[in-house]
């Protein structure tokens, strides 16, 4: 990824966090955190990695809400970031936080057993 793509990625991460927490009023949208954004070098596509707190059903509902609000989110990004073309976004669940929590839990169990 080039320097410009990195800057756009960081700016999108910041703006997406704000949009998801303040602008979207969908009740299906649970506790969502934007953990990262990968933008292609030509700034045409962006993978948005999100962490969702809740059950699998709540995660599924949150993804549905994000897909429904996709156009609104894209237009908001276009208003906030000066780009010739707003990248096409896809949302993916980032399981690294859950994985880290599971490792912490296993380590605590191991320490309690000793």
UniProtKB/Swiss-Prot annotation:
- Name the keywords, alphabetized: Cytoplasm, Ribosome biogenesis
Chief location? cytoplasm
- UniProt subcellular location: Cytoplasm
Q: Name one GO molecular function term.
A: ribosomal small subunit binding
What Pfam families does its record include? RBFA
User: Where does the sequence pass through the membrane?
Assistant: none
Q: Does the keyword Cytoplasm apply?
A: yes
One biological process GO term for this chain?
maturation of SSU-rRNA
Q: Does the keyword S-adenosyl-L-methionine apply?
A: no
Q: Name the source's superkingdom.
A: Bacteria
Give the quaternary structure.
Monomer. Binds 30S ribosomal subunits, but not 50S ribosomal subunits or 70S ribosomes.
Q: What does this protein do?
A: One of several proteins that assist in the late maturation steps of the functional core of the 30S ribosomal subunit. Associates with free 30S ribosomal subunits (but not with 30S subunits that are part of 70S ribosomes or polysomes). Required for efficient processing of 16S rRNA. May interact with the 5'-terminal helix region of 16S rRNA.
Database matches in NCBIfam families: rbfA
User: Sorted alphabetically, which HAMAP family does this protein's record hold?
Assistant: RbfA (MF_00003)
UniProt lists the family membership as follows: Belongs to the RbfA family.
Q: What is this protein called?
A: Ribosome-binding factor A
Q: Which organism is it from?
A: Listeria innocua serovar 6a (strain ATCC BAA-680 / CLIP 11262)
Q: What is the lineage of its organism?
A: Bacteria, Bacillati, Bacillota, Bacilli, Bacillales
